[in-house]
Amino acid sequence: MVNLLNPDLRVRDLRKLVEPHLHEVSWDRGVDETSEWVIASIEDCEHKSKLVNWLNGKNVSDSFEVIITDKAWSNLRYLCWSQVLADLPTYFDQENILIVSSNRTWIMEYAPQQIVRFGQW
């Protein structure tokens, strides 16, 4: 198991521990059997409720630490899972992001087309 919260790791170290292994991710099923993507709209209560239920279904502990970054790894944020859930509009906006578990067991990718996917190593 990898500890991505190690204070000795630089941004480029984190990137090297994650990106080369993205091909190993097993993505959860999405809207149908041909896609791993699901709708990540928070524009109305119904869509937001479906998204939150889907995220809660991933059984991630509220206190679990995650790293959020853009695709260029230029803007890293360290948060607890509960903080992500509490402020989805901040993270699910007009930017591609990766949310990586601090122990590199799972990853979530959001695309600005309001779609998201979740996978595990």
Label for each model-derived stretch:
Residues 1-115, 119-121:
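Structured alpha/beta or helical-core interaction and ligand-binding surfaces enriched in interleaved
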